[in-house]
């Protein structure tokens, strides 16, 4: 009965967040992430009552990651303390980092107990179910694109490519590669038949091809490398892993032939035709290195990458509005400075090296579980060199659990032979379970309360019948604990025509229009600067007598070459050129810190 409950919670935690297609503006992934908090918290609660040996904190193998996370918490606290980072953004970051600590400790605790291998097998079962269902969604998105309704199955915004219900092909491929590791692990643990493993592996590789993700291709090659070098795997498992690149090639050729013969769309062909193989990453990496050179010691501040990058002159910048460097080490170096980023990355690398070293010696099912969990972390780490999957709770939390498991497993033999393991299961359970249960319950409650708080801003972006006037909805949203920056965005970009006048009200001669307030930009600009917000901010700066700063902002906006900003520069085409702020260069180049409201 206990095992069935654990299996149900593992499947729900792994699969449900990636299957939820329904979303509510302004965030397309918030509900998925909130669901991840709730379900992974429930998984922690379910595992907390299992007997595990008591381990002193100084003996815990997960300490390098805990120290790194503590440093990141301090880095997030500092700009909030000094009034730079809005409280809603700081609290969101801190809550996520604390949740990461909970899953890390829970994973390590699971690996130390007698249920360790069983729990990892159930973890793999969860990703197996998630992968099969997401593969089915991928097939529908490519072969029957008219079927998705947006609520149960998401529409693919990229013709001929699968994006899953997470709506991102790279996220889909990362999830599917975890599913592949789970298939190999379950086969090796003799919990999956060979024929079933081959069918499931072929399905996974086919779905990765449908996503046309380059990250997915690299990960498939990594699977083959695992099969090549890990000689402790059975012959059947090694053949399965070594065959994955061949499966990929055959699936790609088959899809290409299908597209040519039937005049269908295969997104992989478009990917091959792209001239910029980096997808603008080389450009954003070059800009990030420039930011690092400008602020090498302290960085631009935690969470301030988009703010600093958008306001710094980069004439050849990528035209997309990047809120991340698409490379974890570069992101950390740019935001928290080279010294602290180097320390954090060194701790992370040490926390990878330690289980990797132990994997060379630990045999049996425990050794296999260690290698599989470590490979899952390595795969998402490689993805983090090209994207930012760990900024999403549905990847971050299971990564923390798997990493904790790998660290706990690498030290389990030493722990179990120590005097600490002589404590009885009953004593150990009573000492450990309440704290983990409380932490898991906090995640469940936190995820649920976050949804309630989110409704305070989601109503701003809906037009339900009987809703309060827009200005009132914005004011209510600005009182949100975690999402007030979304309400600030609405307030900052609110056009005069968006206000809803009272029916039948008299219309006296209006007084002179006051300049737009700058306060809403303090929250909105630190979340994401886009075309609409930059235009509104430039207009507000000019109206408040800061025309030269408005010219600087307009010059930065022009670098993005976005059609939505053409209206701002339309008057500049007239002869002679007007003296308005969008039409002339600023008298000097401003540092991005000078725009702090």
Locate each region found by the language model.
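Transmembrane signal-anchor hairpin modules in multi-pass inner-membrane enzymes, especially those
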Residues: 1-78, 84-92, 98-121, 125, ...
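Alpha-helical transmembrane segments of multi-pass inner-membrane proteins
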Residues: 8-20, 36-48, 73-80, 93-106, ...
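Short aromatic-rich membrane-water interface segments that cap or initiate transmembrane helices
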Residues: 25-26, 84-95, 157-172, 273-282, ...
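Membrane-interface catalytic loops of GT-C/OST-like multi-pass glycosylation enzymes that act
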Residues: 28-31, 87-91, 166-170, 212-215, ...
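Transmembrane alpha-helices of multi-pass inner-membrane enzymes
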Residues: 37-44, 181, 224, 362-423, ...
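Flexible juxtamembrane loops connecting transmembrane helices in multi-pass membrane enzymes
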Residues: 161-162, 223, 251-287, 369, ...
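TM-adjacent membrane-interface loops and short helices in multi-pass inner/ER membrane proteins
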Residues: 168, 282-322, 329, 336-342
């Amino acid at each position: 009965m206990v095992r069935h409950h654990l299996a149900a919670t593992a499947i729900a935690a792994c699969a449900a967040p990636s299957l939820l297609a329904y979303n509510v503006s302004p965030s397309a992934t918030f509900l998925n992430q909130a669901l991840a908090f709730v379900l992974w918290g429930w998984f922690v609660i379910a595992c907390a009552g299992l007997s595990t040996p008591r381990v002193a904190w100084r003996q815990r193998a997960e300490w390098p990651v805990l120290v790194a996370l503590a440093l990141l918490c301090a880095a997030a606290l500092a700009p909030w303390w000094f009034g730079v980072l809005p409280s809603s953004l700081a609290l969101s970051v801190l809550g996520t980092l604390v949740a990461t600590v909970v899953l890390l400790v829970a994973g390590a605790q699971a690996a130390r107990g007698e249920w360790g291998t069983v729990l990892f097998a159930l973890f793999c079962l969860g990703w197996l179910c998630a992968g099969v269902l997401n593969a089915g969604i991928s097939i529908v998105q490519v072969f029957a694109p008219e079927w998705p309704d947006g609520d149960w199955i998401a529409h693919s915004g990229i013709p001929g490519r699968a994006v899953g219900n997470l709506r991102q092909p790279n996220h889909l491929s990362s999830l599917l590669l975890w599913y592949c590791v789970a298939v190999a692990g379950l086969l090796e643990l003799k919990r999956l038949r060979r024929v079933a493993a081959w069918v499931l592996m072929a399905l996974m590789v086919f779905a990765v091809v449908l996503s046309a993700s380059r990250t997915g291709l690299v990960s498939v090659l990594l699977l083959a490398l695992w099969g090549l070098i890990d000689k402790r795997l059975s012959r059947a498992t090694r053949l399965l892993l070594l065959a994955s690149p061949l499966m990929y090639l055959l699936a790609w050729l088959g899809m290409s032939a299908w597209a040519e013969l039937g005049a269908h769309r295969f997104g992989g062909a478009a990917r091959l035709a792209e001239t910029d193989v980096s997808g603008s990453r080389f450009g954003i990496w070059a800009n990030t290195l420039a930011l690092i050179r400008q602020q090498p010691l302290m960085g631009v501040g935690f969470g301030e990458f988009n703010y600093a990058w958008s306001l710094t002159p980069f004439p050849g910048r990528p035209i997309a509005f990047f809120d991340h460097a698409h490379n974890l080490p570069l992101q950390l170096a740019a935001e928290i400075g080279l010294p602290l980023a180097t320390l954090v990355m060194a701790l992370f690398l040490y926390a990878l090296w330690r289980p990797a070293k132990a994997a060379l010696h630990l045999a049996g099912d425990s050794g296999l579980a260690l290698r599989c969990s470590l490979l899952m972390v390595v795969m998402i780490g490689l993805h983090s060199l090209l994207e930012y999957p760990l900024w999403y709770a549905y990847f971050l939390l299971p990564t923390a659990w798997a990493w904790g498991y790998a660290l706990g497993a690498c030290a389990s033999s030493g722990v179990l032979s120590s005097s600490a393991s002589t404590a009885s299961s009953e004593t150990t359970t009573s000492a450990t379970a309440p704290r983990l249960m409380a932490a898991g319950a906090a995640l469940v409650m936190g995820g649920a309360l976050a949804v309630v708080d989110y409704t305070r801003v989601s109503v701003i972006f809906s037009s339900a019948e009987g809703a309060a006037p827009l200005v009132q909805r914005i004011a209510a949203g600005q009182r949100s604990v975690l999402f007030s920056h979304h309400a600030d965005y609405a307030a900052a970009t609110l056009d005069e025509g968006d206000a809803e006048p009272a029916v039948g009200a008299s219309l006296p001669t209006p007084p002179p229009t006051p300049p737009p307030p700058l306060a809403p930009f303090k929250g909105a600009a630190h979340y994401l600067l886009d075309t609409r917000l930059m235009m509104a901010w430039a207009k507000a700066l000019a109206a408040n007598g800061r025309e030269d700063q408005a010219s600087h902002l307009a010059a930065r906006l022009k670098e993005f070459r976005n059609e939505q900003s053409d209206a701002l520069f339309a008057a500049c085409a007239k002869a002679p050129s007007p003296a308005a702020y969008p039409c002339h260069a600023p008298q000097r180049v401003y540092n991005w810190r000078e725009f702090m409201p």
